């Protein structure tokens, strides 16, 4: 899959480590939420991850290092804007489990 060009190259993890940004991880997390509600669609997950990247590129300048929570907030926004409410709920549950 050819993804949308991304200006963000690093993110800040919850433990303050700086790691390489991966759009694949966003697409996989969205896909896993879709699968959790019996609506798996990798192509749609990749398209939604492109929307997240577009929003990231507008919200942060290229030297920014967004926190993982900020990216997750954008994923939730995109899912809700696309009227994928069940998927958004599954994603929020997944996110909450990883926060613990």
Please name every model-derived segment.
Residues 1-100:
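Long, C-terminal-biased catalytic regions of enzyme "large/alpha" subunits
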């Amino acid at each position: 899959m050819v993804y949308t060009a991304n200006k963000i190259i690093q993110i800040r993890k919850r433990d303050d480590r700086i790691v390489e940004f991966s759009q694949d991880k966003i697409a996989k997390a969205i896909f896993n939420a879709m699968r959790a509600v019996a609506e798996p669609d990798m192509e749609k997950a990749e398209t939604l991850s492109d929307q997240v990247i577009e929003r990231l590129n507008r919200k942060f300048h290229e030297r920014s290092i967004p926190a993982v929570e900020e990216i997750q907030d954008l994923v939730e926004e995109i899912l809700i804007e696309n009227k994928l409410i069940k998927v958004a709920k599954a994603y929020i549950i997944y996110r909450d489990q990883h926060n613990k």
